[in-house]
Amino acid sequence: MIRFETMAELVKLAEEKAVPLSEIVIRSEAENTQQSRFAVLVAMEENWEVMKEAIQRGVTNRERSVSGLTGGDAAKLFIRQKEGGYLGSAALATAAYALGVSEVNAAMGRIVACPTAGSC
């Protein structure tokens, strides 16, 4: 059984087995979910695609949530980040991505809630 609770324990396991950290995490997930390694990788790929779609939708659409209280701000921020600014393009783009996913979530769009959508 693969068990770790801290980064130090994860690093130690990876060193003992001479594999990357990611491999330990994949093996742990396969074990915990009783799925094959391949099934875990397929699920990870599907989640990654949903994450990318939510980001893209969030920074390009100006749709409002059902309540009308949120929506469109991520697209504005994404446009602004191309101009640079005080925080720099990378930080503004990251903020736009996070805000975009939050807005997609508020508009009842599809996101990956990992580890929780509560932060949105």
Question: Where on the chain are the PLM-derived regions?
Answer:
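Conserved phosphate/anionic-ligand binding catalytic regions in large, soluble enzymes, centered on
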Residues: 108-120
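Generic N-terminal targeting/processing segments that precede catalytic cores or assembly contacts
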Residues: 1-109
